Amino acid sequence: MAGRDRMDCKGKETRAIELGEESELNLKGNTIHFDGFFSMANHDQARDKEHTQVLVSKGELDLYPWINTMEREKGLKEVLAIMDGCMEGHECVVRFFCLGPKQSKFSILALQLTDSFYVAHSEDLLYRAGYEEFKRLNGSDDFFYFIHSSGELMGDPPVTKNLDDRRIYIDLQEGRVLSVNNQYAGNSLGLKKLALRLGIYKANNEDWLTEHYFIMGVHPKGKNRTSFFCGAFPSACGKTSTAMLPGQTIVGDDIAYLRVWQDGYAHAVNIERGIFGIIKDVNAKDDPVIFEALTTPRETIFSNVLIADGVPYWIGDGRIAPNEGINYSGKWFKGKKDINGEKIPIAHPNARYTIRIEELNNVDPNLHNPDGVPVHGILYGGRDSDTMPPIIESLDWEHGVFLGASIESETTSATLGAEGVRMQQPMANLDFMVVPLGKYIENHKKFGNRLKKSPKVFATNYFLKSKEGKYLNGILDKLCWLLWAEGRTQKEFDAIKTPIGMIPKYKDLKNLFKEYLKKDYSEIDYTEQFTIRIEKLLAKLDRIEKMYNKEKNIPDFFWNILSQQRVNLKELERKFNKQEISPWEII
């Protein structure tokens, strides 16, 4: 049994290589890991939502319509029976971690037991060592714990054999997760999204927040200041590209704890020290900081990409792809198909990289600050083609909670179902929501109301299209939306009040585009982007209402905001006698 902090990260990398869970690549520090694969429809390459269950009491089974729940005693009986003997013949690694900076009021300790040295190596890149912190518990059981086993292994490299018995059961009452018959990090790394769920449960039964947020420092030119922003974006809505904008710094890319601080602000910490990121479409043009880190010598785990002559390749990397190599399906060649006749891509669409944030040249110096950083603004990113402007500011904190609770993400590919369907994603957290949504929203309201200096809240939409189907935003335009939001937190810009929130004035955006992007921002662009589309916005309110009507105990303030916004939009329609109102008319 290997444990404590004495078995350093290098030791677990070496053991993972010895056991075949990882293999060395050409660049020093780079390794490759492959997860199990039987076909494009049957694999261990992504989170298994079907077999991820939240264990609750019998009386709570109907409180969580958006997640899988199971009666606790039944679930424990099932998963413990499957886990009986699951580590036979394996080594068990015992690891002590700290979720958040060391010696911080924010942080929660976490214990991981696993028989995978790949999991142990990944967690050492992603989390802070916590053995010394555990010694200071003095017998307290106030920590999360996670038990994981890959189960019976097969093949070379060794992968989980019995995917049909894959289980990831989250025991809220005990503050633990039991995970078996899997290796993919989203299922096996207890401290990742599994700990996010435990954190949400704990925070919402206390007086703080656990959120699916990035944390970044925003640095306007010539201002000699840093404003810190958090942001929640559903998948494919611009989260990473926002957090990694040029000239800015990153504290964290995924999960944050927030507390009311003595200076009157909400302060936030990154509970992690690394990034477990989707590698698809990371390239030198769009993601220069990450791409440089991934193509230079440093400790990095690649998973489920193609390896050719010791070099990793992935979908959308901007390079000429080889016609053959080794990937998650074994020996790969262009045109290879699985047992069902489905084409196997060069790398899995959910292929990943694991790296310490300190390896990025835009890391913020406050990454390990035990006091966290003051939150000046919060961004909620949605995706729709015809409704929301590129950015709006909430009218107040409660309206900001409403904006976060109203995030929609539009499906973009037929492989995900019907294209163009709006999916509700409150705070980009719905998949991890282990408390009733009404309680979660009410706690957000109460949290902000306890602050003397509550963050300004903004909603973004980088995917608005013209009637001809052309995107109205350039890829880097989001830098100007962010800097406008930063200026609003510092009271530098005026704004136009609309029924859905505050929108920028043209002159301010024109100046930002000129200064930061060297672009002429036209009145035509401004008009198209910030027109209030009444019919579309009313339809959005109808969708929100339909979703929340399925929930119990949604707080009154939420319904009041929704109703008032509907009234105000209809009044605007009557005033101008048309469906689309230009921002110039509202001024």
Where are these regions (language model features)?
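Beta-sheet entry/capping signal
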Residues: 1, 91-94, 213-215, 226-230, ...
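Conserved NTP phosphate-binding and transfer environment spanning the P-loop NTPase/kinase superfamily
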Residues: 4-50, 56-61, 75-79, 86-92, ...
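A contiguous, mid-domain pocket- or channel-lining segment that forms the substrate-recognition surface
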Residues: 88-90, 95-156
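Short, glycine-/Ser/Thr-/acidic-enriched flexible segments
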Residues: 100-102, 201, 219-223, 235-237, ...
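Short secondary-structure boundary/capping segments
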Residues: 109-116, 246-248, 264-275, 283-286, ...
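Charged, amphipathic alpha-helical linker segments immediately N-terminal to NTP-binding catalytic cores
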Residues: 150-212
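Phosphate-binding P-loop
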Residues: 207-210, 216-226
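Catalytic or ion-translocation cores adjacent to nucleophile or general acid/base/metal-coordination motifs
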Residues: 208, 225-309
